[in-house]
Amino acid sequence: MMSKLGVLLTVCPLLFPLTALPPDGDQPADRPAERMQDDISSDEHPLFDKRQNCCNGGCSSKWCRDHARCCGR
């Protein structure tokens, strides 16, 4: 009896993984407009220099690399 239950508990997740289920509507990936509002804008970021329109932090900073050019370049 226990071995049958073990086989059932092993086979069911393999046949029907949870990723096969459709996500519900509350997922952030379904709402890109709200996801964009959560990002900090260039004007508010502490490493962004508004006068020179560039990032005054280290060029290796992930935010600077992704959003603005470095002032040192």
UniProtKB/Swiss-Prot annotation:
It comes from Conus striatus (Striated cone). GO terms for cellular component: extracellular region. This is Mu-conotoxin SIIIA. It comes from the Eukaryota. Belongs to the conotoxin M superfamily. PROSITE patterns: MU_CONOTOXIN. Changing residue 66 to A: 10-fold increase of affinity at Nav1.2/SCN2A without affecting Nav1.4/SCN4A affinity. 30-fold decrease of affinity to Nav1.4/SCN4A without affecting Nav1.2/SCN2A affinity. Expressed by the venom duct. The cysteine framework is III (CC-C-C-CC). Negative results: does not inhibit Nav1.5/SCN5A, Nav1.7/SCN9A and Nav1.8/SCN10A. The keyword Disulfide bond applies. Changing residue 67 to D: 100,000- and 400-fold decrease in affinity to Nav1.2/SCN2A and Nav1.4/SCN4A, respectively. It is found in: Secreted. The keyword Disulfide bond applies. Residues 21-49 form a propeptide. Disulfide bonds join 54-64, 55-70, 59-71. Residues 20-40 are annotated as: Disordered. Changing residue 62 to A: 6-fold decrease of affinity to both Nav1.2/SCN2A and Nav1.4/SCN4A. Mu-conotoxins block voltage-gated sodium channels (Nav). This toxin moderately blocks rNav1.1/SCN1A, rNav1.2/SCN2A, rNav1.3/SCN3A, rNav1.4/SCN4A, and mNav1.6/SCN8A. GO terms for molecular function: sodium channel inhibitor activity; toxin activity. The modification Cysteine amide is found at residue 71. The lineage of its organism: Eukaryota, Metazoa, Spiralia, Lophotrochozoa, Mollusca. Residues 1-20 form the signal peptide. Residues 28-40 have a biased composition (Basic and acidic residues). Keywords: Amidation, Cleavage on pair of basic residues, Disulfide bond, Ion channel impairing toxin, Neurotoxin, Pyrrolidone carboxylic acid, Secreted, Signal, Toxin, Voltage-gated sodium channel impairing toxin. Changing residue 65 to A: Decrease of affinity to both Nav1.2/SCN2A and Nav1.4/SCN4A. The modification Pyrrolidone carboxylic acid is found at residue 52.
